[in-house]
């Protein structure tokens, strides 16, 4: 028998699964909401701007350090039979660490600095920086811009780095490494310092043949190239390859064998294509969760307005992966439910049904638009062909 462990880091919780590799059956699972949740309103009593969405990196290690031992103990499997561990993660969820991979927010004096914390994928505090990067790329007729939907999102890594450069240089001074949170977990597992082609390709303007676009970075800010070169750039491991074996320290901590192999991290929505078998040219998959990602594979790379990236080998080796989607789906359902009047909540409780079930009952006979209410609000930003995350209402 052989088994593998997959750890899925979503927006609100982490989920670890033990899988039988011979048949794909899930043997057991462990789910843990993040201890500190998503930090959006205030940080340690200090109010945050409305566009901030932060997390505490320690929560991610808790999922790993509690989940993996639980799976081994509850299932009774021999750790020697666990051949591999894989990580998927929301993206671009960006971490700033010291040379020992310690999150900057854990260092003395930085516990109240919001820019020292993990910038979650739906953090939109870097809109000004994204606009600057986009305009510079447009002015310089950057060829690659069309492969990112002819726009630059504040959700991506480079604008978030620029935000810290502009707003918190003291954080950058302490930072040795900037990486996707998924890369951080992989590096903690292996004791290495590598990057996945999936995260870099989709969120950092990195291309397999050309690397980072330092020529553009130089025109955006005279410090940006050096920051990316010194703190982001690292050996690349592609999807389908192996980073290496788990370190002795982490093997002992998690109860795994040192023979356990670790894969490069893959963006959470992208991993779904592997799970459902959507691995062929011209197949599209909608991955629905907190947001919804529309993903498609193709043998060729095209410039498509409105997408948020196209990267070779980021899901399946040799195929280009395309991504587009809506930034708020599950989040939007939750938002609507939370606006329910007390009478609705009381009725749902009395009938022992969820507020979602009650709301569905009340609107099931209505046609779309029948009420006359039109809403164009800001919900995690906008990833349509408009790419206008500042839209908040009708004009």
Model-derived segments and spans:
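Structured nucleic-acid-interacting core domains from mobile-element enzymes and related host factors
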Residues: 1-4, 365-372
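Gly/Thr-rich phosphate-binding beta-strand-loop-beta motif of the actin/hexokinase/Hsp70
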Residues: 2-29, 86, 93-96, 287, ...
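Short glycine-rich, Thr/Ser-proximal phosphate-binding strand/loop in the N-terminal lobe
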Residues: 10-54, 109-113
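Glycine-rich phosphate-binding/catalytic subdomain of phosphoryl-transfer
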Residues: 43-61, 66-351
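Short, well-structured alpha-helical segments that form the helix of a local strand-helix-strand
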Residues: 352-364
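Active-site diphosphate/adenylate-binding microenvironment
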Residues: 375
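Conserved small/polar residues in nucleotide/adenosyl-binding loops
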Residues: 392-393
